[in-house]
A protein has these predicted regions:
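Active-site activation/catalytic loop segments of kinase-like enzymes and analogous catalytic loops
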Residues: 153-162
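Loop-centered beta-sheet repeat module
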Residues: 78-125
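ATP-binding pocket architecture of kinase catalytic cores
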Residues: 1-62
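Structured catalytic core of nucleotide-sugar glycosyltransferases
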Residues: 1-18, 71-77, 122-125, 129-134, ...
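A cross-family kinase active-site recognition segment
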Residues: 36-95
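Short, well-ordered alpha-helical segments in soluble proteins
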Residues: 25, 50, 54-57, 61, ...
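Active-site acidic catalytic loop and adjacent metal/ATP-binding pocket
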Residues: 108-154
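Generic structural concept
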Residues: 44-47, 104, 124, 157
């Protein structure tokens, strides 16, 4: 901070900066990638970094009081998902609400059959290209406020869809 404080409180929220991360965001690099092979290489390197992150998380022993979101079936599409009841958004039109409820039901059903077979552990949960910095091939993940326990495919799906 300007005052050399490592933890800053603003409007009841706390912010920290550990160190500056050099490089460009993945979104910037993808927008300026000259060749499809460059994009392929970026995603390849990202996959390696993500696997290393998940493996490190599996080898980490969290402190006894460690609590994070659960991005499991209930946390994603249950009655009280982590990010709220998306189907109850007051801005939705009736047919949009109906569609989201239908998708929620389908996802709930699909995950009920898959959840025991999917790799589950600590995930980033917000791995969008703006939260990935790349500097001379070195990949750094940013913004861990949504980090929690969930399906590892969630991280892969997020980076591919965003």
């Amino acid at each position: 901070s300007k005052d050399a404080n490592f933890v800053i409180e603003h409007n009841g929220e706390y912010f920290t900066a550990i160190s500056w991360v050099e490089g460009e965001t993945m979104s910037y690099i993808l927008a300026n990638a000259p060749e499809p092979a460059d994009v392929s290489n970026i995603y390849h390197d990202l996959g390696i970094a993500l696997a290393q992150f998940h493996q490190a998380a599996d080898n980490w022993q969290p402190p006894a009081q460690f609590q994070r979101h659960k991005w499991d079936r209930n946390g994603l599409v249950g009655e009280q998902p982590v990010w709220g009841r998306f189907w109850d958004n007051p801005d939705l039109l009736p047919d949009e609400r109906y569609t989201l409820i239908k998708v929620q039901d389908q996802m709930n059903e699909a995950l009920s059959h898959l959840e025991g077979t999917l790799d589950y552990g600590l995930i980033h949960a917000d791995l969008i290209p703006d939260n990935v910095m790349i500097d001379q091939g070195q990949i750094t993940f940013l913004d861990f406020d949504d980090c929690g326990f969930g399906f590892r495919l969630f991280d892969i799906a997020t980076i591919l869809l965003k």
